[in-house]
């Protein structure tokens, strides 16, 4: 299973840790799972970590002096340390566990945005943002009188950085940018955006849902004020996301939810708050999920994030080349050697939903629709697209199966 940091991945050994990949679907077809941008699969060591928690030391955290509670509390706190270090943070005080990236976005928008924004302030997003960013900041803007602006994309799917430099001004309070587009695969220069934002006294929130699972991330090198990602896209369980925040910002922010464990002292008149990250984790937290996500980080780091990135880049470039050479196929976004592990496309005369249904008949699982980026699809001039996305356990043979199934669909719909 393991590889050196720069060495190739032993894909067959990796696949052995994922029994689901041995499934047959659609009446006997081998499963070709290419929907990793939506969710990844979970390896046996991570499943074992969840089972071990429930079998051996299931208990609430920060609430008991008995041995089980102490064991669970230590494991849960250590998971914060591990996830903080995974993205280049310094310690657990900078790592809040949420239920997903969307909740992390909402936490910042409502704990920081509602208290800090007002008329005359601007929040600058990109045209390729996920609905979790778009809708959230639109709602905060409606409540505060702030204005939301959007950095346009170029014809080849990159961010227009000249426009970004013009749009980010002293009126900008926050820049929200996706690190890797879940539709175009564009890898955005978030470090450059952070520099521009900070030059104008603004903060930057980076949506790392597609980046953190697939490449080494260093929030200090980026100089991100906030960086969010989800466990289920990086071999972890569902129900857990992560929000990195600079320590001083989290310390200054008001809580997002209220209840147990996020308090320091409560009286009948008022309350004071616990320190970060606990003041943002009200109630019984995501204990099993946090412990399992730490195990997923171990799994990824044993293989090596550089090795994972190299494997995905090779697969993505191959898929891009094969699809662009296929008649009647339009591929969106940057060239194949300049993108994350996502390829969105359409086949002339076939709606993306119909294409996905036909591909399923051949065992190929992709996503079809707007991928929670309706405004971006409006910009592209299409109502929907098909999306193939790759991860560490995918192979060139699976890309070939995708392309062959697309060609079969073309034949079915041929006039």
Swiss-Prot record:
Reactions performed catalytically: (sulfur carrier)-H + L-cysteine = (sulfur carrier)-SH + L-alanine
GO MF terms held by the record: cysteine desulfurase activity; pyridoxal phosphate binding
Keyword Transferase in record: yes
Names of required cofactors: pyridoxal 5'-phosphate
EC number: 2.8.1.7
EC class: transferase
Positions of modified residues (N6-(pyridoxal phosphate)lysine): 233
GO process annotations (BP): cysteine metabolic process
Alphabetically ordered keywords of this record: Pyridoxal phosphate, Transferase
Entry-linked InterPro entries: Aminotrans_V_dom, Cys_dSase_SufS, PyrdxlP-dep_Trfase, PyrdxlP-dep_Trfase_major, PyrdxlP-dep_Trfase_small
Protein family membership: Belongs to the class-V pyridoxal-phosphate-dependent aminotransferase family. Csd subfamily.
NCBIfam families xref list: sufS
Protein name: Probable cysteine desulfurase
Organism: Halobacterium salinarum (strain ATCC 700922 / JCM 11081 / NRC-1) (Halobacterium halobium)
């Amino acid at each position: 299973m393991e590889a050196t940091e720069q060495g190739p991945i032993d894909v067959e050994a990796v696949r052995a840790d994922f029994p689901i990949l041995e499934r047959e679907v659609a009446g006997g077809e081998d499963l070709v799972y290419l929907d990793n941008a939506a969710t990844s699969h979970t390896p046996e060591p991570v499943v074992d970590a969840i089972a071990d928690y429930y079998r051996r030391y299931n208990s609430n955290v920060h609430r008991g002096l008995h041995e089980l509670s102490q064991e669970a509390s230590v494991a849960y706190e250590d998971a914060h340390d591990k996830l903080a270090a995974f993205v280049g943070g310094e310690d657990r005080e900078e790592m809040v566990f949420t239920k997903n990236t969307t909740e992390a976005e909402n936490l910042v928008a409502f704990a920081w945005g509602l208290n800090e924004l007002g008329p005359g302030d601007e929040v600058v997003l990109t045209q390729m943002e996920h609905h979790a960013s778009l809708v959230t900041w639109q709602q905060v803007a409606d409540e505060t009188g702030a204005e939301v602006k959007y950095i346009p994309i170029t014809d080849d799917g990159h961010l227009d950085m000249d426009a970004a430099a013009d749009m980010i001004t002293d009126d900008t309070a926050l820049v929200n940018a996706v690190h890797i587009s879940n539709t175009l695969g564009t890898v955005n220069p978030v470090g450059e955006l952070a520099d521009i934002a900070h030059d104008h006294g603004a903060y930057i929130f980076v949506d790392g849902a597609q980046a953190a699972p697939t490449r080494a991330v260093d929030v200090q090198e980026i100089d991100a004020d906030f960086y969010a990602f989800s466990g289920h896209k990086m071999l972890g369980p569902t129900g857990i996301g992560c929000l990195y925040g600079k320590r001083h910002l989290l310390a200054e922010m008001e809580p997002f939810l209220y209840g147990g464990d996020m308090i320091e002292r409560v009286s009948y008149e008022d309350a004071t708050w616990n320190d970060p990250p606990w003041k943002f984790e009200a109630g019984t937290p995501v204990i099993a999920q946090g412990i399992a996500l730490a195990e997923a980080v171990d799994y990824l780091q044993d293989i090596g994030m550089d090795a994972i990135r190299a494997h995905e880049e090779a697969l993505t470039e191959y898929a891009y080349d094969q699809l662009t050479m296929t008649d009647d196929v339009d591929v969106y976004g940057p060239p194949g050697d300049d993108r994350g592990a996502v390829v969105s496309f359409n086949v002339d005369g076939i709606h993306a939903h119909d294409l996905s249904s036909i591909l399923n008949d051949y065992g190929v699982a992709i996503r079809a629709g707007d991928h929670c980026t309706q405004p971006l699809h409006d910009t592209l001039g299409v109502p929907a697209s098909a999306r193939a996305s790759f991860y560490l356990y995918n192979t060139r043979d699976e890309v070939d199966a995708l392309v062959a199934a697309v060609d079969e669909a073309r034949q079915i719909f041929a006039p």
